[in-house]
Every structure is written in C-alpha cells, then in structure tokens.
Amino acid sequence: MKRTYQPSQRKRKRTHGFLARKSTPGGRKVLRNRRRTGRWRLTV
C-alpha cells in the first residue's frame, strides 16, 4: 500500500509557503497569529 506522505519541496512550498499564506485572508490571519505568538518560523 502506498503511504499518504510523499514529500515534495514544490508541493510543500506552494501549499504552505509564505506567498501562499500571504495571498489569502485566512493565510494572512495565520501569519498574524504566528507573529503574535512569537514563532521563530512563520512558514515552512
């Protein structure tokens, strides 16, 4: 059986990257909250 996690840098960046977060209202909310909690990393 094929496993569910098939890592790919391109997919990872496009789905969870900074520009992806920045481009939607929900993503901007995520960035805002992560900045507020003082995350060392905002995105992947």
From Swiss-Prot:
PANTHER family: LARGE RIBOSOMAL SUBUNIT PROTEIN BL34M (PTHR14503:SF4), MITOCHONDRIAL RIBOSOMAL PROTEIN 34 FAMILY MEMBER (PTHR14503). Residues 1-16, 29-44 have a biased composition (Basic residues). It holds the Pfam family Ribosomal_L34. Keywords: Ribonucleoprotein, Ribosomal protein. Residues 1-44 are annotated as: Disordered. Coiled coil: none annotated. InterPro entries: Ribosomal_bL34, Ribosomal_bL34_CS. One of its GO terms (cellular component) is ribonucleoprotein complex. One of its GO terms (biological process) is translation. Belongs to the bacterial ribosomal protein bL34 family. One of its GO terms (molecular function) is structural constituent of ribosome. This is Large ribosomal subunit protein bL34. It comes from the Bacteria.
